[in-house]
From Swiss-Prot:
GO terms for biological process: L-histidine biosynthetic process; methionine biosynthetic process; purine nucleotide biosynthetic process; tetrahydrofolate interconversion. It comes from Acidothermus cellulolyticus (strain ATCC 43068 / DSM 8971 / 11B). The keyword Amino-acid biosynthesis applies. Pathway: One-carbon metabolism; tetrahydrofolate interconversion. GO terms for molecular function: methenyltetrahydrofolate cyclohydrolase activity; methylenetetrahydrofolate dehydrogenase (NADP+) activity. NADP(+) binds at residues 165-167, 192, 233. This is Bifunctional protein FolD.
Length: 293
């Protein structure tokens, strides 16, 4: 019997339907949420990802505000766009598509954002609020992982969780989320300096692979019945010479795990859904609506 597939596409569709209703209530009060995107450069993957975000906006009734700059844009030019969106009342929240082209200071750009308009939850102020367990926009991918586990009723309280990867967008932030009292998991963060990764993974009830190493998590190191979430994505060249994207989890893990969020179709759609959730929640806060349960 194989793993239960954690279908991020299906869950994300449910979330978008829920958000559509909430946006309708906001519109009834004269509030139109708006998502801004700042895209610098001509990376095809970034352009495709941003286009997907705006398609999602159209589905739920959120206005789109697009700002695109060439790869040659200076730090000052990017800063000017940030200042514009900070001041624009039509922009409820916005994201800066990362990575930025070489030569631009990503941290300086993120720090310049209005924390209240940080739709990605990556502003230093909002990450600090997460550390302090205070309300605020949450990083989208970690929030998507957590919501996917909840919707499939995967036990989290008291679970031993291994997160492979210590990047701020997934690994470190996810550990902070899962150790809140509302989740009460015990989290081990593994990385390139971890000795005997397999030993850590074997005892985990939940494994989140976000290292960017294809096939890193193999069936022999997964506890039978564990939940495994594949967040890794790496561009590789196949035997046929064509490029494709692959995750961190070996396909055969589905024969051992109890639950599996595959790549693609698992966490990715949830990340986009959580971005819109952050925008809608920001609009509700601004309108004085009670916090959603």
């Amino acid at each position: 019997m194989g793993a239960v597939i954690l279908d991020g596409r299906a869950v994300a569709a449910d979330i978008l339907a829920e958000l559509t209703e909430r946006v309708g209530r906001l519109r009834g009060q004269g509030v139109l949420p708006g998502l801004g995107t700042v895209l610098v450069g001509d990376d095809p993957a970034s352009h495709a990802y941003v286009a997907g975000k705006h398609r999602d906006c159209a589905k739920v009734g959120i206005a789109s505000i697009e700002r695109t700059l060439p790869a040659s844009a200076s730090q000052a030019e990017v800063a000017a766009v940030i200042d514009e969106l900070n001041a624009d009342p039509a922009c409820t929240g916005y994201i800066v598509q990362l990575p930025l082209p070489a030569g631009l200071d990503e941290v300086a750009v993120l720090e310049r954002m209005d924390p209240a308009k940080d739709a990605d939850g990556l502003h230093p102020v909002n990450l600090g609020r997460l550390v302090l367990m205070r309300p605020g926009p949450l990083p989208c991918t970690p929030r998507g992982c957590l919501e996917l586990l909840r919707r499939y009723e995967v036990p989290i309280a008291g679970a031993d969780v291994v997160v492979i990867g210590r990047g701020i967008t997934v690994g470190r932030a996810l550990g902070l989320l899962l150790t809140r009292r509302s989740e009460n998991a015990t989290v081990t963060t593994c990385h390139t300096g971890t000795k005997d990764l397999a030993a850590h993974v074997r005892r985990a009830d939940i494994v989140v692979a976000a290292a960017g190493v294809p096939g890193l998590v193999t069936p022999d190191i997964v506890k039978p019945g564990a939940a495994v979430l594949d967040v890794g994505i790496t561009r590789v060249i196949g035997d046929d010479g064509r490029a494709r994207y692959t995750g961190d989890v070996h396909p055969d893990v589905r024969e051992v795990a109890g639950w599996l969020a595959p790549m693609p179709g698992g966490v990715g759609p949830m990340t986009r859904a959580m971005l819109l959730a952050n925008v809608v929640e920001a609009a509700e806060r601004q309108a004085g609506f009670p916090a959603a349960s």
